[in-house]
Amino acid sequence: MEKSGGRIVMDEIRSFEKAHLFDLGHPLLNRIADSFVKAAGVGALQAVSREAYFTVVDGAGFDSNNVGPPSEITGNKKHRFPNLRGESSKSLDALVKNTGKESLQWGLAAGLYSGITYGMTEVRGGAHDWRNSAVAGALTGAAMAMTTSERTSHEQVVQSALTGAAISTAANLLSSVF
């Protein structure tokens, strides 16, 4: 491959990172929509690839916890999408439904986080630091905890908020190092 061809590809990738997919008239809306769509695509890809992995592992008779063949096959495996077994249209419907649900969750998290960090940066006079990341991570973590199941306890919400704040703050602090 020529060096100029490699440069063109890298320039395209860099321009994709800077360009927004939508122009909704306000930078906040553009950022939320852009983050939502990109993360939803990643979430859908992750959900489908995870289910493909479990389908291959189950079809080959391997235990997903060990590398080799299982000594004893148990029915207690925990799959994220338990209705995805067989070759029926019901199985495909379950895959589409669950992939959509997961991509919506990923998009919600990214859009919410991106919108909160943008809003906090604007409110704080252009300061984008670990405080913005901590607040956005905490609110996003709490929102994600509330969307994952119907019976979410307040302890789970608090734990998810703290985890979101910690991960977001660490990512912000480490981004200046690397």
UniProtKB/Swiss-Prot annotation:
Residues forming coiled coils: none
Record's bilayer topology term: Multi-pass membrane protein
Residue ranges of the TM segments: 103-119
A biological process from GO: monoatomic ion transport
Tissue spec. comment: Detected in pollen and seeds. Present in leaves and cotyledons.
Keyword Transport belongs to the record: yes
Gene Ontology cellular component list: chloroplast outer membrane; plastid outer membrane; pore complex
Inducing factors: Regulated by ABI3 and ABI5.
GO molecular function: amino acid transmembrane transporter activity; porin activity; protein homodimerization activity
Region annotation Contains beta strands: where it falls in the sequence: 1-102
Keywords noted in UniProt: Chloroplast, Ion transport, Membrane, Plastid, Plastid outer membrane, Porin, Transmembrane, Transmembrane beta strand, Transmembrane helix, Transport
Subcellular location: Plastid, Chloroplast outer membrane
Function: Voltage-dependent high-conductance channel with a slight cation-selectivity; selective for amino acids but excludes triosephosphates or uncharged sugars. Non-essential amino acid-selective channel protein and translocation pore for NADPH:protochlorophyllide oxidoreductase A (PORA) and possibly PORB.
Quaternary organization: Homodimer and oligomers in membrane.
PANTHER family the UniProt entry points to: OUTER ENVELOPE PORE PROTEIN 16-2, CHLOROPLASTIC, TIM23
Similarity-based family: Belongs to the Tim17/Tim22/Tim23 family. Plastid outer envelope porin OEP16 (TC 1.B.30) subfamily.
UniProt-recorded name of the protein: Outer envelope pore protein 16-2, chloroplastic
Origin species: Arabidopsis thaliana
